[in-house]
Each structure stands twice: as C-alpha cells, then as structure tokens.
Amino acid sequence: MGIPKIAGYPLPTPAEFPDNRTGWTIDPDQAVLLIHDMQEYFVNYYQPDSSPVVDIIQHIQRLKAAAKKAGIPVIYTAQPANQHPTDRALLTDFWGPGLNGDHVPIVEALSPEEGDIEYVKWRYSAFKKTPLLEFMRAQGKSQLIISGIYGHIGILSTTLDAFMLDIQPFVIGDAIADFTREDHLRTLEYVASRSGSVKRLDEALDEIRSQKPLTLEQIQQDVATSLGIQPDEVDLDEDLMFVGLDSMRAMVLVEKWHQQGENISFGQLMEAASLREWWLVIEQARNEEQTMAVA
C-alpha cells in the first residue's frame, strides 16, 4: 500500500510523442494552466536531482512564465495533510492515509505567486470537490493546459473529466511525470487517441505566444477577469470606476496589452471612462502607429 519509490527515467523524445486525433491548438484567451499536485510529498518519491522530476520542474517554470505573460490564469492543486478517513474514503484502500503534516507545500521552485489560484484537492481529478469547473465557466474558459504529477492517475483523470465536461484538455507531455516511463508513454497515447491533445513544451509555448490582435470583446473579458465578474456584467458604456476598476488593476491591464503589442499608455486610458472609449483610444493609437510606419 502507498506510493512506491520511483526510479529515474528520461522524458519521452519528440519522436515518441503520439499523433493526436484532433487538430486542437491552444488559444491563450480560452486557456487555464493547471499545475497538478507538485507538492514536496509527491515529488520526494522520485530520485532527487535526476530526470524526470528535475526536467519537468524546469519545463513547468517555462510554461508558467509564458502563461502569465499571456494573461492565462494559473491554478495549483494540492492535497491536504491529515485527511479524515471519511474525507479520504476509498483512496485509503489504494494509497494509505495520505499526507501527514510534513512536505505538504508545493516545491519551492514552483511556489505559487501573487495572482495564482490554489485549490485543495481531494480526489484523482482536479475537477472533483474543487471550484475548478465553476471558475472556468465563470471566466468563459474552454481549454485546460495540464502539467504536473502523476500521469496515469491524477493527470489522466483530470483530462478525462475535462473532455467529458466539453473542455479541451492539453497535456504537456514533457511537463508531466509518472511512476515509470512505460506509464508515462501509455498516458500520452491514451490522451492523444481518446480524450485530449498531447503537446511538447516547445509546441505549447509557440501556441501560447502567438496571440491574436486585441479586440473589444477581449478587453471586456480582461476587465471582467480583473474584477472577478462575468463579461456581461461590464457594460461597454459604463464608467469603469463605478464597476470597481481601480488604477492598480488598470495598470496591470495596460501591461498585459503592451505584451500583446498595443502601444498605449496608462495616462491615455485614464482620460477615457468606459470600455468603448478605451477601445477608441486603442484604435487611435494603432492608426497613429501605422501612419508613422508609412511615413
């Protein structure tokens, strides 16, 4: 009973990645990044300072950095310590009593940062007994980028649940780890052929970074996300101060839009009151930039 000690193994090579049955691509506007169960307790079953765990930590760091730059929400799951037998239920029959008070935190190299979301996880799937689905529905998100451990247990269960909830799951095949290399490869094969899309890290990064031009609808979505409300609650002609948008949130939004290629300043936006007026400022800045480029 319990989790076995895990021998090191090399991550799958690009040639070993399975062909996907779908042609899905990651849309940064629709995606959420899940960092699944990267707690000291689970990571410590791997051999320290060796593949796959050292490699996937580095890969998840890169994935998270790209996601945050693209404005993709980052969600962590972590199991609690000292679970009551009633809460743990059937998991005890397979894995014992679970975590004690030690080694519960996320590994230091992947520690959650300000703005990241943390959910307590009780079952294999990240959707069970957590607010993950409600969050994604409220934010209008339809894609889940999945990283972490263990591949054939929680990663696969979460992928299957996402698929059956009409959410496109993307498993980053070299940003997950498993009990064995064979388990790892079987997980990727199953996902690619039955329930989701398997991506290499480099593929995922390219898709995350290939952002579409900013639209009025995306501005509305970004403001709603910043305020923790739904997009239809942000009227295009309402004064944004009355909705609750303060200067700090506005500065964060301006920085996000800078990263998407918009040449606007915080001062310019503050001279406008509503979303529709903000959009006019952005369009004017685009026109001026095009005029200067032609000249």
UniProtKB/Swiss-Prot annotation:
For region Disordered, the annotated ranges are 1-21
Q: Which Pfam families match?
A: Isochorismatase, PP-binding
| Cofactor note as given | Binds 1 phosphopantetheine covalently.
What highest taxon heads this organism's lineage?
A: Bacteria
Q: Which pathway does the record list?
A: Siderophore biosynthesis; vulnibactin biosynthesis
Query: Which residues are in the Carrier domain?
Result: 207-286
Cofactor(s) the protein requires to work: pantetheine 4'-phosphate
Question: Which Gene3D superfamilies does this chain map to?
Answer: ACP-like, Isochorismatase-like
Tell me where in this chain the PTM O-(pantetheine 4'-phosphoryl)serine is found. Answer: S247
The protein's Enzyme Commission number: 3.3.2.1
Phosphoprotein as UniProt keyword: yes
Which reactions is this enzyme annotated as catalysing? isochorismate + H2O = (2S,3S)-2,3-dihydroxy-2,3-dihydrobenzoate + pyruvate
Record function comment: Involved in the biosynthesis of the catechol siderophore vulnibactin. Vulnibactin is a chelating compound involved in transporting iron from the bacterial environment into the cell cytoplasm.
Q: Which family does the UniProt entry place this protein in?
A: Belongs to the isochorismatase family.
What the entry lists under PANTHER family is as follows: ENTEROBACTIN SYNTHASE COMPONENT B, PEROXYUREIDOACRYLATE/UREIDOACRYLATE AMIDOHYDROLASE-RELATED
Record protein name field: Probable isochorismatase
